């Protein structure tokens, strides 16, 4: 089986792998990719993080499960070939930051590979998104790269702001969920 994977590389030299869960019809057709089978978060010396590759971010339950495990930062590496596809990833990633009261970092590929089928054109704009509340940017955009431009994007984030949000936020999406009416759970 062939998977689309992302690697988490830690400063101490250890690493772990995340397999993309939701494979697009095009990825199945062109590359024969299969979807992974594990939803998980990762402990690091900076924060508890989650990884969702591209299309996975369009499924809100995945990040909600990770948030219930204490995720503070969600990383979304992606490769999109059109502005429409990019917009889906960006809008969903921004929504995940608000819904799950976490930081979301998206990092996309840009450029052209004219001789590679299904990789010939890429469009991206990397960014860092936040919840929309008093301690954060009004529009929930901490930093964004120049569209479709190769560059390095740096942004400092303060994890203590998430703790304040969980306690004193004008809305508390995680705390105010009506778990007496519904739940999101993982089938093991």
Predicted regions mapped to residue ranges:
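Short Gly/Pro-enriched turn/cap motifs at secondary-structure boundaries
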Residues: 30-32, 117-118, 174-177
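A short C-terminal boundary segment appended to hydrolase-like catalytic domains
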Residues: 157-188
């Amino acid at each position: 089986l062939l998977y689309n994977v992302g690697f988490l590389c830690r400063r101490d030299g250890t690493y772990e792998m995340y397999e993309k869960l939701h494979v697009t019809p095009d990825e199945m057709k062109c590359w024969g990719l299969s979807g992974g089978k594990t939803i998980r978060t990762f402990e690091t010396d900076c924060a508890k993080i989650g990884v969702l590759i591209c299309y996975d971010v369009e499924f809100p339950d995945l990040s909600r499960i990770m948030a219930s495990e204490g995720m503070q930062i969600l990383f979304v590496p992606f490769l999109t070939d059109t502005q429409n596809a990019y917009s889906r990833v960006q809008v969903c990633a921004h929504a995940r930051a608000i819904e799950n009261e976490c930081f979301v970092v998206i990092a996309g590929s840009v450029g052209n590979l004219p001789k590679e089928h299904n990789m010939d054109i890429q469009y991206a704009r990397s960014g860092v998104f936040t919840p929309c509340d008093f301690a954060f940017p009004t529009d929930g955009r901490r930093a964004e790269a120049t569209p479709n431009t190769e560059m390095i994007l740096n942004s400092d984030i303060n994890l203590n702001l998430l703790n304040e949000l969980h306690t004193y936020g004008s809305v508390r999406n995680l705390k105010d969920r009506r778990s007496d009416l519904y739940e999101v759970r993982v089938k093991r």
